[in-house]
Amino acid sequence: SPVPEESETMIANGMVEVISKEELSEAVGFPVKSAQSLPFFPQSIYYTSYWGEMAQIDYANGGSMACFRQSLGEEDNSGDWSEYPAQKSLTVNGCAVTLKGEADSYTLAIWQDGTYSYSLSLSAGQPASVWESIVEGVA
């Protein structure tokens, strides 16, 4: 008997992988932003909808990785409950951004804009000055 073709959309645990930012926006029901000023050039980009409520975009290039999340509301959507030794607050585009990581080598940023919550994690820590331009580049 013929093997059924795999559909383009894989659904597991409420996760749906799609192929573009536009499809991701449709899947979650709001316009999804993306990280456009990462400290590395992404060779691979993966788009995932979680439960039709949270957008996740994963960026990768070799060992360098970034994970961007956007959801409605003001909840921390990072899924990262680690205790970090260092935390710093800065204001970017009028939003209060919390950086977490090692002293002057932060790997996680969390912020809200009044409508959406955002988080961005990096595999390699960056100083606050670099994070400022990374967060400014989320559009």
Which positions does each model-derived feature cover?
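Surface-exposed amphipathic alpha-helical segments
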Residues: 114-139
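Short, solvent-exposed recognition patches
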Residues: 2-117
